[in-house]
Amino acid sequence: MASPGSGFWSFGSEDGSGDPENPSTARAWCQVAQKFTGGIGNKLCALLYGDAEKPAESGGSEPPRATSRKAACACNQKPCSCPKAEVNYAFLHATDLLPACDGERPTLAFLQDVMDILLQYVVKSFDRSTKVIDFHYPNELLQEYNWELADQPQNLEEILMHCQTTLKYAIKTGHPRYFNQLSTGLDMVGLAADWLTSTANTNMFTYEIAPVFVLLEYVTLKKMREIIGWPGGSGDGIFSPGGAISNMYAMLIARFKMFPEVKEKGMAAVPRLIAFTSEHSHFSLKKGAAALGIGTDSVILIKCDERGKMVPSDLERRILEAKQKGFVPFLVSATAGTTVYGAFDPLLAVADICKKYKIWMHVDAAWGGGLLMSRKHKWKLSGVERANSVTWNPHKMMGVPLQCSALLVREEGLMQSCNQMHASYLFQQDKHYDLSYDTGDKALQCGRHVDVFKLWLMWRAKGTTGFEAHIDKCLELAEYLYSIIKNREGYEMVFDGKPQHTNVCFWYVPPSLRVLEDNEERMNRLSKVAPVIKARMMEYGTTMVSYQPLGDKVNFFRMVISNPAATHQDIDFLIEEIERLGQDL
């Protein structure tokens, strides 16, 4: 595939300074938006800048330059003095908005009011005095509001109320005290990119319908492969609807690499295939095996040590057992950042075993891949460059708005051979441009959402160094939490030693249990503590943190930090809140 030129398409220098002669990122977007959004793109740019860009001249390969501007509305005043208050939404319906005749003014007013609702929500998300969640039980919400779909349309006043109600009861995942999931935080540039992506409303299967986005996917995936350590960023990749699908892509491609005939003839034409992954790995490996007809029984779970890392000797033992039974080992999936412990499998040792037995090595770095952006922490993924494929979710540790997951493959062209179906109504071979940019045939999907723009725009805004600071801060906050609770009365660590990732796993032991002997009764009572505290957190709306059992360990808290808005004070608050809510248990 030919490489796009430097400048607008590139990420700029590592320090985030970029090329001074290039337009700013947002302005650059507005310069090209008209190519695939038409008037709507110009209107949104007008909302951003108070003016609108004229359509760029056709022809030429250079990104269009800024042109003369026109007013966004009839009044031509800043701020706009159009009589917005005269719009009575009670008498307007969706049919009164664009493309309706004379629909421009109500459309602008309606979208501005929606924007006001969104911006109020954004501001509240960072206000520590607001609740993380206004929790109601499902039956309460069902009874309080009529959520049913009707045959007749509702007016726009009711539609705006639905927008407000939906956000009122939504989780504020950007709140600095929301620690419940691996994906937290709310990045303003990423949010803006998501809005613009939805406005463009295009598909990713061919260059002709997504020219900018296809190029951005190319340069972004190439950059990610360079960071992994593949020479010159060589290889292939795709953005998929989450890490589970990325992992399934890896299984699909690994199977095709070993037995290409399976594409036409199916599983009946190949011997029984066996995949290997750690007992702490993500459940998506088994889901992928089920979906691909390999079967969950063909996924062998490898023992982990006390820190949750795969034991290489057990991996080799299980590979030999499978071969002795006449089965064919085809994939080993190592994990870089397990979901619960945040453990990193020993990738170099796993790579040696995969090379020895000629097995595809996949690294599920959905959670831990972000650490590759940090010079301080990337050593934890040493050996990832030897993998055949890597899953990396920027929507987790890097804070990109959901969804943004990439599957990176070391061998170029393999994904295309595995998945292409040559649909002639999409992938005509006599088009007038370089067909290597028609990337849709290597995807399982036909309709594919534009996920790259959020990551690309954030990268332009933050630079690699900005992501590094983000990662380092979150890891430092996890170390801060660990340093406080490791010797604090009422806390017990699930495993010894400083966490490798931002996962901090611990039990809170209420005063009533501290005097009990470490026996079955104590464990039974301790198992009920975390669920009760979590329920109280949600009912008060003060904070949220996850809990779970694992193996023979009863329910414990799993604290994860991926939101750079969090501070030491938020960690202190969490500790105090756990103690307040659990003191009487």
From Swiss-Prot:
The stretch of residues making up the signal peptide is none
**What is the originating organism of this protein?**
Canis lupus familiaris
What name is this protein filed under? Glutamate decarboxylase 2
Q: Which Gene3D superfamilies match?
A: 3.90.1150.170, Type I PLP-dependent aspartate aminotransferase-like (Major domain) (3.40.640.10)
> Does Hydrolase show up as a keyword for this record?
no
Domain of life, source organism:
Eukaryota
User: Where is it localised?
Assistant: Cytoplasm, Cytosol; Cytoplasmic vesicle; Presynaptic cell membrane; Golgi apparatus membrane
According to the UniProt entry, what is the EC number of this protein? 4.1.1.15
Q: How is it modified after translation?
A: Phosphorylated; which does not affect kinetic parameters or subcellular location.
User: Where substrate is bound, by residue?
Assistant: 181-183, 558
Note down the stretches annotated as region Disordered: 1-25
Essential cofactor(s): pyridoxal 5'-phosphate
Q: What keywords appear on the UniProt entry?
A: Cell membrane, Cell projection, Cytoplasm, Cytoplasmic vesicle, Decarboxylase, Golgi apparatus, Lipoprotein, Lyase, Membrane, Neurotransmitter biosynthesis, Palmitate, Phosphoprotein, Pyridoxal phosphate, Synapse
A Pfam family that this protein carries is Pyridoxal_deC
- Does the entry feature the keyword Phosphoprotein, yes or no? yes
Offer a single GO CC term for the protein.
Answer: cytosol
Reaction(s) the record says it catalyses: L-glutamate + H(+) = 4-aminobutanoate + CO2
Q: Which family does it belong to?
A: Belongs to the group II decarboxylase family.
Q: Phosphoserine occurs at which residues?
A: 3, 6, 10, 13
InterPro entries in UniProt: PyrdxlP-dep_de-COase (IPR002129), PyrdxlP-dep_Trfase (IPR015424), PyrdxlP-dep_Trfase_major (IPR015421), Pyridoxal-P_BS (IPR021115)
Sites of S-palmitoyl cysteine lipidation: 30, 45
Top enzyme class: lyase
Primary place of residence?
A: cytoplasm
> GO MF terms on file?
glutamate decarboxylase activity; pyridoxal phosphate binding
